[in-house]
Amino acid sequence: MKKVLLVGAGPAGLMAAEVLSAAGVEVHVYDAMPSVGRKFLLAGKGGLNLTHSEPPAIFVTRYGKRQAQIAALLQDFGGKAVREWAGTLGVETFVGTSGRVFPLDMKAAPLLRAWLQRLRHPTRGPAVQFHMRHRWTGRAGEPSADEVGIGLVFDSPKGELSAHGDAVLLALGGASWARLGSDGAWVPWLQTRGVEIAPLLPANCGFDVANTVRTGPGATARGWSPYFASQFAGQPFKSVAISFTTTSGARFARKGEFVATASGVEGSLVYAASSLFRDEIMSQGAATFYLDLLPDLSLEHVLAQVRHPRGSRSLSSHLKSRLHIDGIKVAILHEMMSKEQINDPLQLASAIKALALTLAAARPIDEAISSAGGVQFEALDPNLMLTRWPGVFCAGEMLDWEAPTGGYLLTACLASGRSAAQGVLSYLSRSIS
């Protein structure tokens, strides 16, 4: 029986293990964490977004510069296949109003339990064997006289040990949420073998705004004023729109919501544009987008309401009465505008429809939902095997791709794990012949 060493017990690794075990391969899964699927469970805390229901032709566009490579992976395991697979685990799914697909109970734990039950007690093929608290050291072990194939060296609770298999599949994740296992430590290990790796960068991340206190006490290089940060951090901007054009001409415009943080912004609308913001900051030093606080109203209508006589009412009361702007939406206007500007009806109306916010930096990668960069597809053959390390395959977020939230991340991880496992099977069949 052929044996495969699989490093990484996240979604990509578990899917690869399922495919290999069902094909009759002895699979040993190694992971540095005490239990399986740590990041997967965290992703399901607010509702496990399995995939998206949109048509495949639109679905693949979410992968940006790598959509051609990801499209090849999704051909056999796209959104529809993910739902069908979940069904085989006894997990029914539904499509939310946004087109996102969730389990009926919204939870990740029941799906993971059913999945592990299948892997540990399969109806066909050998049981997958799990070795937790085993951290790959980045070193390859030398086989002894009675061993063949590829060896890896692990740090384990019992000390350093070597394991050998006929092939290796790496599903080590990116570099976000290091405490859950994805720490990016593997990057220099593969680089020393000549593997081309794009730098790991934060994706689906928050950003620090450029300083809004320009001079005087409290002035900082970046971040909100002390008052705004203390009063409004954690509050959402609801029913707004943002628009952004990069210096190279790429455009983004979308309605939705996001959240103010102590130093900037985060949330679904920001995440959707995060790759553009990040790359603009890296090339230009900053990124300025425009916030529309009332996307369903025209500038002319807003201006008319701002100019409407307000009598003895305060400006805040006037805006709340005429335009239903209050709370954080009023606060951001005061944060970004001078007293003279905010008392000028035309400047105020223009700011309500297009308030410029400048982002100074992406938040650290360890805070990001996911990461961009990784093993470049040019370093892999069509079966996801490293050309510089024959018999070693890669899958999941450690590959050089990124996608927004919405089910695209998990779908591509599952699809790449499945594809890499099929590549392993092809490799093993060739080695037999």
Describe every region a protein language model picked out.
Residues 22-23, 35, 56-58, 75, ...:
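Residue-level recognition of phosphate/Mg2+-coordinating polar/acidic sites
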Residues 110, 118-320:
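Predominantly flavin-linked oxidoreductase catalytic cores and closely associated redox partners
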Residues 176-189, 193, 400-432:
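A conserved FAD-binding loop/helix module that cradles the flavin
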